[in-house]
Amino acid sequence: MEIDFSPENFTNQDYALRLVDWMDLEAQAIKRKFHKGLAVFAICALLCFIPLLFTGPSFAWENGPLEIAQNVVLFFETCLFLYFYKNAKGSRYQRLWGSVAILFLILLGRELSWGRVFFFKEMAPYGPAFYSLKEISYGFLVNWVVEALMLLTLFGLFRYAPWRAIWKEIPKPWILMALVVIRAVLSSLGDKEKILHTVFDQTIEEYAELLMYILIGFGAYWYYCWIRWMENRK
């Protein structure tokens, strides 16, 4: 909805009232788009699970289709928040978006086993095996780099996130949070083969993990939209 805020069109009181109306409309639009996106995600997640019933164990192996999909999602989310960081010049929250980008980068590094997946060793009964970090030339640096990135991320989140607004003003995405917890539980149970007690549990684990990463990205984008809305309101 476009509103002409030219001073000659109405008084200061009218301006304030219409600005409030416009911000309320924008807030409603954020909620609508988010809930619509979440509904589309749920339908697609269910439809995509059906073909997985006919796949073999190799589909969930390291460097398999599900693992690659996880890496693509995390890479996209990292790039998305780097883009937000770049375009937030002059904003007090610019470094917050940079911290979120680093968080997704850490998750991506974890899924890539810190680069181990690029050093194939042999094919084992459970799938491809890779050299350990101790056997890779840069392995001794990994822990130091990861810890530094984690500290940088935690500092950025605690220092630059508007925690008061997050707790008191910004709506909580309760449905999304519940879905993330459910996916995390399924991933953990699947890893221990405690769902169906078959090798298909590995596929459930990897698929649940993929959905969890997508939902975390949804959540990060939810707060990005609301913090931007909060900035515009002020």
Q: What are the residue ranges of the model-derived segments?
A:
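Membrane-proximal helix-loop-helix units in multi-pass membrane proteins
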Residues: R110-W167
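Juxtamembrane "helix-exit" motif on the non-cytosolic side of transmembrane helices
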Residues: F49-F59, Y160-P162, S188-T198
